[in-house]
Design a protein with these regions (language model features):
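Extracellular/periplasmic bilobed ligand-binding domains
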Residues: 1-22
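Extracellular/periplasmic catalytic domains that process cell-envelope and extracellular macromolecules
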Residues: 12-15, 74, 100-103
Length: 149
């Protein structure tokens, strides 16, 4: 089951407590994610971003950096730059794009807090463990992607 922070917010901690889930992003992971999420929340009526919001931000930011580095909007040249450049932004301090286009980055196993553990709105997760990038995705040689030669 795919569960987002917004789902937990809608369910409430009383209902969602104890649920374990994986996410690639949580607003309260570190100082950088907290600062980015604060700016997001100011524009979104106090709502905190989900991993989808953060992922789109990282993807578009990386794409624009790749266009700049390629000096063109040619899709093949931009895709090549996307694979060559490190993904580095407020969400992902260091990630890479594989030959098949998959972003290699850690994921996180979280457990939803009990109501009494939360300090306020959107303080919903406690980190159980970080899942390293190499464990979070299928190995390149098992994917059968036509981009991999």
């Amino acid at each position: 089951m795919l569960t987002f922070l917004s789902d937990v917010h809608s369910l409430g901690l009383k209902t969602a407590q104890g649920l374990q889930l994986t996410e690639s992003f949580y607003w309260d992971l570190n100082d950088s994610t907290r600062a980015w999420s604060k700016r997001f929340g100011e524009r979104m009526n106090g709502r905190m971003p989900t991993m989808v919001h953060a992922g789109v931000y990282s993807a578009v930011t990386h794409y624009l950096k790749a266009i700049r580095a390629a000096g063109t909007e040619n899709s093949e040249k931009v895709a090549e730059q996307m694979r060559l450049l490190k993904v580095s932004d407020a969400i992902l301090p260091e990630a890479t794009v594989r030959q098949d286009g998959r972003v290699l980055r850690p994921f996180y196993l979280f457990e939803v807090k009990k109501p009494e553990e939360s300090k306020g709105p959107y303080d919903y997760y406690k980190l159980v463990r970080e899942i390293p990038a190499n464990e979070a995705v299928r190995p390149l040689n098992e994917g059968n992607c036509p981009l991999v030669k």
